[in-house]
Amino acid sequence: LDTCSGSWALLGNVVPRDSFVVSKLRSAGAVLFGKASLSEWADMRSNNYSEGYSGRGGQCRSAYNLTVNPGGSSSGSGVGVGANVIAFALGTETDGSGE
């Protein structure tokens, strides 16, 4: 899958292999539906910008209140599950998104 960490700098970057978790899911027959928005560079770019923002995807919003951001680096994963668009999602705990 293309992996850009929400940044234009990595556009077109393709990782050489699946992560351990993704390879286990595929082996078990899981179908991957896609990738979700995340804070640019997994929220490690700066402390002075809105969580859930990336140059590639723009500002991710809460599934229930469009005036707030969902917070955390894996914000798109949380929003997708919260909105019942997908049954489960994978995310990383980088800056509070797994709380």
Please identify what each model-predicted range represents.
Residues 1-95:
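Gly/Ser-rich catalytic/binding loops embedded in alpha/beta enzyme cores
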Residues 99:
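Conserved catalytic cores of soluble enzyme domains
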